[in-house]
A protein has these predicted regions:
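Collagenous Gly-X-Y triple-helix signature in extracellular proteins
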Residues: 160-422
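Conserved hydrophobic/amphipathic alpha-helical signal-anchor segments
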Residues: 73-109
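Long, compositionally biased
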Residues: 137-160
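Extracellular/periplasmic head regions of type IV pilus-like filament subunits
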Residues: 102-139, 298, 320
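N-terminal targeting leaders characterized by basic, low-complexity, disordered sequences
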Residues: 1-38
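Substrate-binding/catalytic groove segments of enzymes
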Residues: 96-101, 120-127, 374-377, 405-409
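N-terminal Sec-pathway targeting helices
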Residues: 42-58, 68-71
């Protein structure tokens, strides 16, 4: 009995010993597995750090090589960029020597690139154009007491020559003799028809203009594409003939000429101005920037009175009286010439609205008064010209004249790709 009991206890002890041994082995395996996982994770982290380091070093090497290459390689500038460099160089030169600037608005002078190079205002032209042989100069014109226009001219053999805006428009490839387009007409180059590619804008503005014509002085006449935000009276002075304030159709002393002056200066709808302020009108979109104004010239706006039955289209009637200004309104004859309808004969022919890009849009004022009634002026009404009492209100589409020195930067004349003036 005792032997049996001892055997059972021995077997139980051996069994417990075996179980403890198995548990110990299991715990050891589990710890080893954890250690292996930690080791694998650490090895993976080290590999990723090495890979990340290699990528960073590679980027640094590539960027460093690019920088070193850039130090030893020249940038090739475009011709337009070189013209801008010439212009900036001339501005710097005359900041150093202001007494050399033109003294009057009638005076114009040229400064050659060789002078600008000698004065360290710019480098040799071939530096910018990788050895191309070019010559150039910058013309300086006085615009007002403190404003000057700087116009660069660059010629590089047969490869490139600065293009003036008027020459680009007058190019023979643009001319047509029928249909819509640019006509040689009465000694001028006139856009006629409905769908014509005569859109233009200044390089620093999105405001669109339409090219009306290139006149005999090579000034490009532009009219604002969209009409003004506000409606304005042409004139609302007391008229003795009618004993009321229906206005007088004398442009030189009219309210509209004064309004246009404010419009040109961007002073319509401002809070603190003495007139045409925000109590009367909403603020108009800025007409021209300071830089844009250096590219336009004062012109003789043709403001003579015209009768309803007048059939002339050469401007002789309207231009019998002129008003000098930087901004004006379209003369009637320019509207008539824009139509290619053969039935557009007199001032008020309804057919003049046909095949005429100028007939679109709001009712707008023209520059000319009626030849028969002193309180009536011409406006575009429903697409054609009609007599309107001067004290009525209409929108305006101002005109300006580009200097013959204004340049073409790019563009095709379409609404989406207009000619760009610089």
């Amino acid at each position: 009995m005792n032997n049996k009991l001892r055997n059972e206890k021995l077997e139980e002890a051996l069994e417990n010993d075996s179980t403890e041994k198995e548990n110990l082995e299991f715990e050891t395996d589990e710890e080893n597995e954890k250690d292996n996982k930690k080791l694998e994770q650490e090895q993976f982290r080290v590999k990723m750090l090495k890979l990340f380091g290699i990528v960073i070093i590679g980027l640094v090497v590539v960027l460093g090589l690019g920088f070193i290459i850039s130090l030893f390689s020249k940038k090739e500038y475009t011709y337009v960029e070189v013209e801008d460099i010439m212009k900036d160089a001339a501005i710097s030169y005359f900041e150093e020597y202001p007494k050399k600037l033109p003294a009057t608005t009638d005076e114009s002078l040229e400064v050659s690139t060789s002078i600008l190079i000698d004065n360290k205002n710019m480098k040799e032209i071939d530096h910018y154009l990788n050895g191309k042989s070019c010559k150039g100069n910058v013309t300086v014109d006085k615009i007002s007491s403190n404003e000057y226009a700087y116009t660069p001219y660059l010629k590089c053999g047969n490869d490139y020559e600065t293009t003036t805006f008027y020459n680009a428009i007058k190019n023979e490839k643009n001319l047509v003799t029928s249909g819509y387009g640019l006509y040689s007409y009465n000694g001028e180059y006139v856009y006629r028809g409905k769908n014509v590619d005569n859109y233009a804008r200044f390089s620093d503005s999105k405001r669109l203009f339409r090219i009306v014509k290139v006149n005999k002085d090579n000034e490009v006449v532009l009219i604002q594409d969209e009409s003004s935000d506000n409606e304005y009276p042409w004139d609302d002075r007391y008229n003795k003939v009618y004993d009321d304030n229906s206005g007088i159709n004398d442009y030189k002393n009219s309210k509209i000429s004064d309004i246009l002056s404010y419009y040109y200066k961007g002073k319509i709808g401002l809070e603190n101005d003495d007139k045409y302020n925000y109590y009367e009108y909403s603020k108009e979109v800025k007409f021209l920037t300071k830089e844009d104004r250096t590219k336009i010239v004062k012109f003789k706006n043709c403001v003579g009175r015209r009768s309803e039955n007048d059939t002339s289209k050469d401007g002789s009637v309207e231009c019998s009286s002129t008003y000098d200004s930087e901004i004006g309104l379209l003369p009637v004859y320019d509207f008539l010439n824009a139509s290619i309808d053969p039935n557009c004969i007199t001032t008020v022919s309804p057919s003049c609205q046909n095949y005429n890009y100028l007939s679109d849009g709001d009712s707008t004022w023209f520059a000319n008064g009626s030849g028969s009634e002193t309180n009536e002026v011409y406006s575009m009404y429903l697409g054609y010209i009609a007599n309107t009492e001067a004290s009525e209100t209409n929108n305006i589409r101002p005109i300006i004249h580009l200097s013959e020195k204004a340049m073409l930067e790019k563009g095709k004349g379409t609404k989406n790709n207009p000619y760009v003036i610089r």
